[in-house]
UniProtKB/Swiss-Prot annotation:
UniProt catalytic activity: UDP-N-acetyl-alpha-D-muramoyl-L-alanine + D-glutamate + ATP = UDP-N-acetyl-alpha-D-muramoyl-L-alanyl-D-glutamate + ADP + phosphate + H(+)
Gene3D superfamilies named in the record: Mur ligase, C-terminal domain, Mur-like, catalytic domain, NAD(P)-binding Rossmann-like Domain
HAMAP family per the UniProt record, alphabetical: MurD
Pfam family, one: Mur_ligase_M
Lineage: Bacteria, Bacillati, Actinomycetota, Actinomycetes, Mycobacteriales
Protein known as: UDP-N-acetylmuramoylalanine--D-glutamate ligase
Length: 490
């Protein structure tokens, strides 16, 4: 399983971020000769100063074409797309390319960290973090040793390395990027929650995106969300010996679902009531579905109903996930900045009867038309920010023509001081509030949203896009929204 990894084996590590550091630490621990490549000279210098062999990405790309194999393996950070030049060159030179998850899986399965763990893996376009966190809580409530890792914040390699006591289970959240570079992953159980357009700027096609997600269904137990047509279709294609679905409605045999106000398991028991729906702290159908998905994975390894009910009842959402930041003058302000794609934004909007929608950012190649059409009856206004705001505006004009729309326009230059607030084609105000471009944009957006909102409405930040055009991440975007709201209502 690890034929290419022997002491002294030359391995190229692509990317010097958090993942790259974890990969370097693991390779060094087991005696491989690791070289780091990156296109950031400052990052390379920091590693070189600490004794790490480094090379520029351009040089590493050229090395792939030189006679004789310079590297026996490339381990890449998940953000590096298959079209990245060094990876294209490695593929052409027939050098294997793994991601950090692939490396972690192989090392763990080969016993490098002691007895192999049982991997329970969660993926999907939306709901991954909540579901994985619930799963981890269920395992802990049943006195199972479990570690929470993956796309949720801690690289799997770091978790395996830093915890001396072996864990029985890994509750792992994985993105499509991570799964693309993990071809041999075979988890104990895996779930695909849902599949909607996302990251099409990284994956070449929707089929490739779906194929990456389906890699979690290659182990003993495959679980899919039956209310999502794309996810449900994967159940008939998986090779897993145990196939399970979950749905918001009444479950058939082999499914988990809802009956008479209870979550019910008919997959791992004949007919077992797990817990009342009313005890789920995450409101709406999305909370029920996340709990069902987590319960399916937990039940697949024998976690009892009492532990599942206790874990969910005590569960609390993380920051920037439907987080109420203020209520003033009868208007509720909600930060759902984690809604970074159209499907997530749709689910968020549908949870409220009357919404002033604050949206926009980087759509990553995804269309918003279908989602805007479905949410249109809930919308009483929209305030659009970010680079791809015009695409959202066009969808609103087609599917919600009577909804007032305000666009907050900012230049690409981060040093720009003026932010124009535009309604239709007319600039209606200019704001110069100081601070970062993100701060100025959000202050203007909140002011516009307050003008549109009436008592009983919800001003909802559910952007439908990534944040990196104007913010350092979704957390920064959410924090900036909350700060702007609190300043506005003082």
């Amino acid at each position: 399983m690890l034929d290419t990894l022997v002491p002294g084996a030359p391995v190229l590590v692509a990317g010097g971020g958090v993942t790259g550091r974890a990969v370097l630490a693991a390779l060094t621990r087991f005696g491989m000769a690791a070289t780091l490549c990156d296109d950031d000279p400052a990052a390379l210098q920091q590693y070189a100063d600490n004794g790490v062999a480094t090379v520029s990405a351009a040089t590493a790309t050229q090395q792939m074409f030189e006679r004789g194999r310079k590297y026996v393996l490339v381990v890449t950070s998940p953000g590096f797309a298959p079209t990245t030049p060094v990876l294209v060159a490695a593929s052409a030179a027939r050098v294997p390319i793994w991601g950090d998850v692939e490396l972690a899986w192989r090392l763990d399965a080969a016993g490098y960290y002691g007895p192999p763990r049982r991997w329970l893996v969660v993926t999907g376009t939306n709901g991954k973090t909540t579901t994985t966190s619930m799963l981890h809580a269920m395992l802990a409530a049943d006195n199972r040793r479990s570690l929470l890792c993956g796309n949720i914040g801690r690289p799997v390699l770091d978790v395996l390395t830093e915890f001396a006591e072996p864990s029985d289970f890994l509750a792992v959240e994985l993105s499509s990027f991570q799964l693309h570079w993990a071809p041999s992953l075979r988890p104990e159980a895996g779930v695909v929650l849902n599949i909607a357009e996302d990251h099409l700027d990284w994956h070449s096609t929707m089929a490739d995106y779906t194929m990456a997600k389906a890699r979690v269904l290659t182990g003993r137990v495959a679980v899919v969300g039956l209310d999502d047509s794309r996810a449900a279709a994967l159940l008939s294609t998986t090779v897993a010996p145990v196939r399970v679905g979950f749905r918001f409605g009444e479950p058939a045999v082999g499914e988990l679902g809802v009956r008479d106000g209870y979550l019910v398991d008919r997959a791992f028991a004949e007919d077992l009531a797990l817990m009342p729906v009313t005890s789920i702290p995450v409101s709406g159908p999305v909370g029920v579905l996340d709990a069902l998905a987590a319960a399916a994975l937990a039940r697949s390894v024998g976690v009892g109903a009492t532990a599942i009910a206790d874990a969910v009842a005590l569960f609390r959402l993380g920051r920037h996930r439907a987080e109420v930041v203020a209520v003033a003058d009868g208007i509720r302000y909600v930060d759902d900045s984690k809604a970074t794609n159209p499907h997530a934004a749709l689910v968020s909007v549908l949870a409220y009867p009357r919404v002033v929608w604050v949206a926009g950012g980087l759509l990553k190649g995804a269309s918003v038309d279908a989602e805007v059409a479905r949410m249109a009856p809930q919308l009483v206004g929209a305030v659009l920010i970010g680079r791809d705001r015009a695409m959202v505006a066009e969808a609103l004009s087609r599917h919600a023509p009577n909804v007032p729309v305000v666009q907050v326009v900012a230049g690409e230059d981060a040093g720009m001081h003026a932010v124009a607030v535009v309604s239709g084609t007319d600039v209606i105000s200019i704001s110069d509030v100081g601070g970062t471009i993100g701060t100025r944009v959000m202050v203007a957006a909140v002011a516009a949203a307050r003008d549109l909102a009436q008592p009983g409405d919800t001003v909802l930040l559910a952007p439908a896009g990534a944040s990196f055009d104007q913010f350092s991440g979704y957390a920064d975007r959410g924090d900036t929204f909350a700060t702007a709201v609190r300043a506005a209502i003082r």
